[in-house]
Amino acid sequence: SQAGDDIVVAGDGDNIIIAGSGVDEVTTGNDDDIIFGDNAKLTFNTQGQPTELLSTELDFGDVDTIIAGDGNNMIAGGRASDAITTGSGVDLVAGDNILITLTQGTASQTIPTLMTPVDDIGGNDVINLGAGGAFVIAGAGDDEVTNAAGDSVIIGDQGTIHFAANGLYANAFTGDVDIVGNDTLTGGSDSDVI
């Protein structure tokens, strides 16, 4: 519950960053990163691959800035009003707190099966997506999501995304209609579901 204001700069490679509850700035290079702006618990299989990413200590969190490079990133801003920017790649992005589950894919990779919020508190997030496609649950608050390119699924408030066995989304639906905000959602140059 107590944390400082961190500046984290990570280079290329598959990075795992849990910034904690302070006002944090996180910048990563290319490759596949897992980034939580606030607190989280991560579960791995015996091969060292992630199987569950879960936001924790939900009452604590602050304003974070997250800039991720190219690659297939999984990012959660956390409780407060966060700014998230991604590069090229197929990204999973949550403006607030989130649960992401994954299953065994190839020998070196797991693929997502579920993405859903874990509480009803969130800030006014600004999410800028690069090319490549993304799956976004902006969450509570007045959020702004802008997609550059790539076939993306964007939910402005609460919702859940289920994925098929190949990692492509199978269905997406909105959540609690009482948890809403005045969101601005802008699609890119390809086919988006908003």
Regions found by a protein language model. Name each.
Residues 1-16, 29-70, 87-131, 135, ...:
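Acidic/polar low-complexity surface segments
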